[in-house]
Amino acid sequence: MPIITLPDGSQRQFAHAVSVMDVAADIGPGLAKACIAGRVNGELVDACELIEADASLAIITAKDEEGLDILRHSCAHLLGHAIKQLWPQTKMAIGPVIDNGFYYDIDLDRTLTDEDLAALEERMLALAAKDYDVIKKKVSWQEARDVFEARGETYKVEILDQNIARDDQPGLYHHEEYIDMCRGPHVPNMRHCHHFKLQKMSGAYWRGDSNNKMLQRIYGTAWADKKQLKSYLQRLEEAAKRDHRKIGKQLDLYHMQEEAPGMVFWHNDGWTIFRELETFIRGKLKEYDYQEVKGPFMMDRVLWERSGHWEKYAQAMFTTQSENREYAIKPMNCPGHVQIFNQGLKSYRDLPLRMAEFGSCHRNEPSGSLHGLMRVRGFTQDDAHIFCTEEQIMEEVSACIRMVYDVYGTFGFENIVVKLSTRPEQRIGSDEAWDRAEAALAEALVLNGLKYDLQPGEGAFYGPKIEFTLHDCLDRAWQCGTVQLDFALPGRLGATYVGEDNERHVPVMIHRAILGSLERFIGILTEEYAGLFPTWLAPTQAVVMNITDNQADYAVKVAKALNDAGLRAKADLRNEKIGFKIREHTLKRVPFMLVCGDKEVEAGKIAVRTRKGADLGTYPVEELIALLTQEVQTRGQKKVEE
């Protein structure tokens, strides 16, 4: 007679074993209809799972995040069902859930087209409309292997042979005549899978290994209802308009080319944004009392072996040889900063020592993962390392947190998710040291009034960390900032200081990044602002335009006055209609368009328009310079009204 305890603490007693679905039906028909799966004693299970003893149970529906993942996974099976009906010769590989959707890798003797994708989606809709039951059967390893071998599913057989223990009982999910294999759970009926969209196709090597066969990957998205699907597709459409690669080309910010994959060719306007970001962060470094240093971008393999990076990052490092020595181009800055710390005897009085660098790093990322500015091989980190005592951790981490929010707030990012990752099973250092370190990070977060998600076991082996994830205007997540404690690297590289007891001690090292990589952050900003960079970041802040040749000299004079005041301005003297000029510079996202006709020349003024189409009237030139300068210097805190 199992007693089922529900999330609200209420209990229900049954005279015999019951399934998750039985319990949902006992609560009410509405919940039974919505039930996708259950969480029994903390473990996700199918709705058909029998509960034979007392247990806690949460009914999972599509409104739950877990329910949405289950729904998406079942849509991957639905895709497999449709593929096998249209092209029975297809061999199915894997079909996992990803952010906002799913994909399936398939081996087919023809290349799929956009028309095929449309046909697949149509067949999926027709199958889902049948609202058929999904039947789960747990079978022996051998029985599962026999099923897929008989169907010619060589990839499923390989998964069984290489990834599933012989004493395991794989779950086979029956979608009418189609069978797929999965640990589950999956939806009990396809009525839950009506709101999906196939999106695109790409190539993917089997098991991600370029030595294996190239498969075809089909991507899709799935949601709980029509409204959610429509909203997501609208966000995708908006994201496409904001694509930094597209805007970067329109605004002539940068380019990339095949001869230097993953490396950025910055053009003048893009480099202007880059340097403004550097200047901004450099000002914050001074405000928060950092030293700025510069380390070499290439060091001997011996140093990377001592730091431990050679063992863990060798495949991602670019190397070269000279005079029988092997060198590696740095993938990160920390070992170099320890070398700078090691120059000269350090006392406890010298701590905390805060060391920052705009470090040029390189990582040999797989070519298939490269994506504009978001994923590159050559990048610049706004990296810092703080050497301190254990007693100083909380105060230093708290200052890092304040700096992170100070910087993000300037760019208008307010939705920031904070995660605290604690000790993993495999780690160095004593439990007491980890206790103190984790407590210091948690205390610093609380001190700054921040809520955080705890991620047990997700810290690095050398220390706990805090992660800061930005959510942009399209609610996409970008993990940028980190504050990471390191008990290992200083000791490995011989960093010590003399304590009050006149003994040598190894300092604690705090790795701190805010923007992460400047290249990636510029990509994020480009999409967040849709290219409408705030005035202080805009490559060209104002364009002065004459109406006729009579005002050309005056336009040049005004542009010079703006530039002399430290603003970035140009004069557009082309013999074009003023409306044409305004439209062109609006498309270039120039914040202010300054127009001068005979009236403005005579009055010593300038007519001001914004890129958003607002007519701000006429201003004396000196007054406008003062207003624009104030907006730039305050980084948008005091705006010229748009």
From Swiss-Prot:
UniProt GO BP: threonyl-tRNA aminoacylation
GO molecular function: ATP binding; metal ion binding; threonine-tRNA ligase activity; tRNA binding
Named cofactor requirement(s): Zn(2+)
Enzyme type, top EC level: ligase
Location of the region described as Catalytic in the Swiss-Prot/TrEMBL record: 243-534
Catalytic activity: tRNA(Thr) + L-threonine + ATP = L-threonyl-tRNA(Thr) + AMP + diphosphate + H(+)
HAMAP family, per the entry: Thr_tRNA_synth (MF_00184)
Family the entry assigns: Belongs to the class-II aminoacyl-tRNA synthetase family.
Protein name: Threonine--tRNA ligase
Protein's gene: thrS
